[in-house]
């Protein structure tokens, strides 16, 4: 006597749904592999992936009572589909969307650092114009400017502004707090700040836009 | 007069380093007597500041050379109201202090040992009742020096070599001039002999030192060669043991193989006749048959599952090679996976039923 997989209509419907879930997970695994191996274009991947994710969410919602844990389901039927499970259960969005979001986050933080650099440049130059030339007045401003320049990853390590600010900080650290820059030194520092600022603006991407 | 503290400190350091030497240059005294030897020498130098402790090479009568401690210098000899200094060497032999030291009168170039002397031999060796009656541990160097001084005072062992007197005039009494020639001759011969002996002794001593160095080098070479040979012997022994063990292992393996050969031979002899009974048109598919319907169904489901897996694998290759479009590929993967699920689920269910059946049969067997 052979064993029947189902004995009534309801049971058959359940196994039909299980089969569909199984097929979606398997297909997603193949899709992830194809995307990783660069066998399909990102747009092609994204379209197909979105479709599979939508199908998966719809089906798993209706099967919530019978399949409360997808990992258990995959384990029961001996599926080796870790990439698919991550994509469908954990991430919930295609890899292209996920990585684009990460890039956006990086861009936004970069913008705030750029604004910080500009602010520090302008503050330093204005302070010199106001004849604030004592070491304990100038040093903190240059220190902040140097720190913000170092935070910006788009600038090269040998960027003019970084080197100049480091030299000035070294020079000021050898002077006493109440010592003042000579008129010649103040003019030189202002000149260095201005040329560094111009180089900085030129180094920014899409400055013209 | 006590010696200056600096000198005593120096002597202390010298004795400490000499008596604590190790290795080939170690002094040959018994370890438990070294502190007493040190004390004797320090007491001697404290009382007789004209003596100095030294280490030097002593040559025994049988030719052996050995480095020993000695006290070298002079001992005061009061004689007729004047104090003279007699040069002596006190050798502390290996057996000291249980046995007496060896004392020599050590004349300078212009001194001659009196011949004969009651205590001093022509070669300078001193003999005293104190030395002959040496008692350990009460006898010591200070008392020895005191006895030497007293003995020498009674009978001085040395006198200066005088220049030959002017030619005797005939007018002087013949009795005075008669003994001169033999004394002169004896003195000259004695000096020459002593000088010759000293030079020979020095030459022999130098030769012995050189020979000793050469022998030491040779001995070290032989000792290192011996250690090399010993190490090589050990290696050869180890190699031999390993070969013996390997031989035993191989013999055991040979026995196992022989046994297996016998077993297989027996099987062949038993089954040789059966080959003739085999049908020519044997059907491979019917060679094995499942024991029951559940097992048959299990076999079918598993075969179908694996077949679909192979198909999907082939499709992967086709898609990778570019001969299968992506949309077709993914659609077919999904369809085949759906079908595969049914087979896999059925197999899982059959397995559960078989397990239950096994458990039931075991329980029934236990119950009966």
UniProtKB/Swiss-Prot annotation, chain A:
Tagged with keyword Mitochondrion: no
Gene3D superfamilies noted in UniProt: 1.20.120.1130, 1.20.1440.200
InterPro entries named among the record's database cross-references: ESCRT_assembly_dom (IPR037202), Vps28 (IPR007143), VPS28_C (IPR017899), VPS28_C_sf (IPR037206), VPS28_N (IPR017898), VPS28_N_sf (IPR038358)
Keywords: Endosome, Protein transport, Transport
A GO term from the CC aspect: ESCRT I complex
Domain VPS28 N-terminal: 1-99
Coiled coil: none
Domain VPS28 C-terminal: 109-205
SUPFAM superfamilies with a match to the protein in the record: Endosomal sorting complex assembly domain, VPS28 C-terminal domain-like
Biological processes annotated in GO: endosome transport via multivesicular body sorting pathway; protein transport
Stated role: Component of the ESCRT-I complex (endosomal sorting complex required for transport I), a regulator of vesicular trafficking process. Required for the sorting of endocytic ubiquitinated cargos into multivesicular bodies (MVBs). Mediates the association to the ESCRT-0 complex.
Classification via PANTHER family: VACUOLAR PROTEIN SORTING 28, ISOFORM 2 VPS28, VACUOLAR PROTEIN SORTING-ASSOCIATED PROTEIN 28 HOMOLOG 1
Subunit structure: Component of the endosomal sorting required for transport complex I (ESCRT-I), composed of ELC, VPS28 and VPS37. Interacts with ELC.
Family to which this protein belongs: Belongs to the VPS28 family.
Protein's recorded name: Vacuolar protein sorting-associated protein 28 homolog 1
Originating gene: VPS28-1
Curated annotation (Swiss-Prot), chain B:
Region (Disordered), start-end ranges: 155-184
SUPFAM superfamilies: Endosomal sorting complex assembly domain (SSF140111), UBC-like (SSF54495)
Coiled-coil region: 234-255
Keyword terms, alphabetized: Coiled coil, Endosome, Protein transport, Transport
One Gene Ontology cellular component annotation held by this UniProt entry: ESCRT I complex
Record Pfam families: UEV (PF05743), Vps23_core (PF09454)
Residue ranges constituting the UEV domain according to the UniProt record: 18-162
Localisation: Endosome; Prevacuolar compartment
Domain of life per record: Eukaryota
Predominant location category: other
Gene3D superfamilies to which the protein is assigned, alphabetical: 6.10.140.820, Ubiquitin Conjugating Enzyme
Family according to the record: Belongs to the ubiquitin-conjugating enzyme family. UEV subfamily.
Name of the protein in question: Protein ELC-like
Protein source organism: Arabidopsis thaliana (Mouse-ear cress)
Gene name, Swiss-Prot/TrEMBL: ELCL
């Amino acid at each position: 006597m052979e064993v029947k997989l189902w004995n009534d209509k309801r049971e058959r419907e359940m196994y039909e749904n299980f089969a569909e879930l199984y097929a979606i997970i398997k297909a997603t695994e193949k899709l992830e592999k194809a995307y990783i191996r660069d066998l399909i274009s990102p747009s092609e991947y994204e379209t197909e992936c979105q479709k599979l994710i939508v199908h998966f969410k719809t089906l798993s919602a209706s099967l919530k009572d019978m399949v409360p844990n997808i990992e258990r389901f995959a384990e029961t039927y001996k599926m080796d589909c870790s990439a698919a499970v991550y994509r469908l259960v954990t991430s919930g969005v295609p890899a292209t969307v996920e990585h684009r979001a990460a890039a956006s986050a990086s861009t936004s933080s970069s913008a705030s650092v750029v604004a910080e650099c500009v602010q520090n440049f302008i503050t330093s130059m204005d302070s010199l114009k106001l004849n604030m030339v004592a070491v304990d007045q100038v040093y903190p401003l240059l220190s902040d400017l140097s720190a913000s320049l170092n935070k910006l990853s788009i600038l090269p390590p040998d960027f003019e502004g970084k080197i100049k600010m480091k030299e000035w900080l070294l020079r000021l650290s050898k002077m006493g707090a109440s010592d003042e820059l000579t008129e010649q030194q103040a003019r030189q520092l202002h000149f260095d700040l201005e040329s560094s600022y111009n180089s900085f603006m030129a180094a920014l991407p899409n400055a013209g836009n | 007069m006590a010696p200056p503290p600096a000198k005593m400190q120096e002597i202390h350091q010298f004795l400490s380093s000499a008596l604590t030497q190790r290795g080939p240059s170690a002094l040959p005294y018994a370890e438990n007597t070294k502190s007493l030897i040190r004390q004797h020498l320090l007491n001697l130098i404290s009382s007789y500041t004209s003596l100095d402790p030294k280490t030097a090479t002593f040559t025994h009568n049988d030719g052996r050379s050995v480095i020993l401690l000695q006290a070298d210098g002079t001992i005061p000899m009061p004689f007729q109201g004047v104090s003279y200094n007699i040069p002596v060497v006190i050798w502390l032999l290996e057996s000291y202090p249980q046995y007496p030291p060896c004392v020599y009168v050590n004349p300078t170039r212009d001194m001659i040992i009196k011949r004969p002397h009651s205590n001093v031999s022509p070669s300078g060796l001193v003999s005293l009742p104190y030395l002959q009656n040496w008692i350990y541990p009460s006898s010591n160097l200070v008392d020895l020096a005191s006895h030497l001084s007293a003995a020498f005072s009674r009978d001085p062992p040395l006198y200066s070599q005088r220049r030959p007197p002017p030619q005797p005039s005939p007018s002087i009494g013949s009795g005075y001039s008669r003994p001169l020639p033999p004394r002169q001759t004896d003195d000259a011969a004695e000096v020459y002999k002593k000088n010759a002996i000293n030079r020979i002794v020095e030459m022999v001593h130098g030769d012995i030192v050189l020979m000793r160095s050469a022998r030491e080098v040779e001995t070290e070479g032989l000792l290192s060669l011996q250690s090399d040979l010993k190490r090589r012997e050990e290696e050869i022994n180890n190699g031999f043991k390993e070969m013996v063990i390997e031989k035993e292992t191989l013999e055991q393996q040979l026995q196992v193989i022989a046994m297996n050969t016998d077993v297989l031979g027996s099987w062949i002899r038993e089954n040789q006749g059966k080959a003739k009974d085999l049908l020519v048109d044997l059907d491979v598919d019917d060679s094995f048959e499942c024991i029951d319907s559940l097992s048959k169904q299990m076999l079918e489901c598993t075969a179908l599952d694996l077949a679909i897996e192979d198909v999907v694998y082939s499709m992967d290759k086709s898609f990778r090679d570019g001969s299968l479009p992506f949309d077709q590929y993914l659609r077919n993967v999904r369809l085949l996976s759906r079908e595969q699920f049914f087979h896999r689920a059925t197999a899982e269910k059959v397995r559960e039923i078989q397990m239950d059946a096994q458990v039931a049969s075991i329980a029934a067997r236990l119950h009966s």
